[in-house]
Amino acid sequence: MFIGSNEAQATLIQLLVERVLKELDSTPLNVAPYTVGLDSRIEELMSCLDVRSNGIRVLGLHGVGGVGKTTLAKALCNKLVGSFKCLVFMENDRENSETDDDLVYLQNKLINHISPHKPSVFEVNSGISAIKEVVHEKRVLVIMDDIHNVRQLEVLIGRRDWFSEGSRIIITTRNRDVLPDHLVNGFYEVRELAFTEALQLFSFHALRREKPTERFMNLSKQMVSLTGGLPLALEVFGSFLFERWRIEEWKDALQKLRRIRPHNLQDVLKISYDGLDVQEQQIFLDIACLFIKMEIKREDILDALKGFGFRAEIAVTILRARSLIKVFEDNSLWMHDQIRDMGRQIVLDESPVNPGKRSRLWDRDEIMTVLKAKKVRPIVRYLISSSFFSCSFSVALQVQNFSKRQI
């Protein structure tokens, strides 16, 4: 094929870019292979969005952690593939996203999704102008997952009139109060599963069947009642019991549930952590504290952990079987933020006041404070902060004894 001018070449390149982006937009997002009650909720949301109508709708999905907001948003996104010129699922991979640097990072991420040829911005106001420009060009679906504060919405979504007619914006959050009425014109509370739905989900993960056998039915019902209707708790606790066929083991697990605070998600998750061996626990804590939110591949984590003398392959397989981590089709590793928070709380409890006495540090301010003071006990194993690095994978610094080093 002969291209006769620079203008023609530029046009062809633009067409190719648009074709590639359309293919990427049509790639389904990873959703749990087994879900319960999802279809009826999607139908309710489709009615709320009314995608065939003009106008701009902003829908806020709110609910407690672990209730399935992200899963629902991803499934809805997959349902709407092909209905918009551009489809964006924005994961909030900056844990606080309150500093200008974090907000600019998220702005660039959104801009790049919609218009990859646009140059990067370097300050918030420029980002706002760039976002207004790109979202006004085409009918888009934007899903903002796990929004923590109003400021994030102000610099990423702003106002409805920024967007082209027919656009839809979906926001997920644990906190209903971060959804301002002047921006959001539809609200949907994601509620816990009904008891029959919860029993079905628990049974799948514990027994790989839709309904418990008579032998396990009574124990299963008691466990579901104590666990509550949170899909995350049901999945993790059910996976904890998978391939445990002795009634005595189930009764022991039931007693553990009875000893924790009623329907407390973190306590339920920790039962699964307590069931790991020592090395598996260490690897779980490494992943929770150091590698999550870094867009990291499974092989990279395995290489890093093997470098520290761990039999990482077996441990990662066990963590995956327990539903404590997930490995997606692109081989990226993912951990639910509630599970991550449980792991980090274990490390924080090692020394609530003095971060230098903890086994792992991940907060950049705490890292700098400890390094400046040059006071780290020998058991501090790793320091890492993804905010310090611009690359997708950062190397953990293994610490032997800072008292013997000049930092």
What are the language-model segments listed below?
Residues 1-10, 23-29, 110-122, 165-169, ...:
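Non-catalytic, charged helical/coil tracts that couple and regulate nucleotide-powered enzyme cores
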Residues 90, 188-190, 383:
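Hydrophobic residues at beta-strand termini and immediately following loops
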Residues 142-144:
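Hydrophobic residues in beta-strands of the RecA-like P-loop NTPase core, especially within AAA+ ATPase
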Residues 161-163, 213, 240-283, 288-407:
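Surface-exposed helical/coil interface segments that assemble multiprotein signaling complexes
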Residues 2-67, 71-86, 91-93, 102, ...:
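N-terminal flanking helix/linker immediately upstream of nucleotide/cofactor-binding cores
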